[in-house]
């Protein structure tokens, strides 16, 4: 399944803001470049599973929880 890039970035941005983290702090915790995180959140780049895993751990979330949020965001655009 291919996710829409914006549907991937938005839940990451929301989770980051819920935790009160800046992009600089989250990217540091996740071990990725801030510019990479910015591109993911803006929907300009699609992260691989390893990056999603790193971001989830940095957000103190289970990777499955972050993936579920991404899936939920993706399904918002699918008509019933």
Stretch-by-stretch model annotation:
Residues 17, 28, 57:
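Alpha-helical residues within the helix-turn-helix
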Residues 12, 23, 34, 49-52:
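Helix-turn-helix DNA-binding elements, focusing on the entry/boundary residues of the two helices
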Residues 57, 65-80:
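Short, charged recognition helix plus adjacent turn
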Residues 44-54, 63:
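Short, basic-rich loop-to-helix N-cap that marks the start of a DNA-contacting helix
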Residues 1-18:
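A short, Lys/Arg-rich alpha-helix, primarily the initiator
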Residues 20-39:
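Short alpha-helical DNA-recognition segment
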């Amino acid at each position: 399944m291919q996710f829409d890039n914006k549907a991937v970035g938005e839940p990451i941005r929301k989770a980051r803001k819920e935790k009160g983290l800046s992009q600089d702090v989250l990217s540091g915790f996740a071990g990725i470049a801030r510019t990479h995180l910015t591109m993911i959140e803006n929907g300009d780049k699609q992260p691989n599973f390893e990056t999603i895993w790193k971001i989830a751990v940095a957000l103190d979330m289970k990777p499955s929880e972050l993936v579920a949020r991404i899936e939920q965001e993706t399904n918002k655009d699918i008509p019933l």
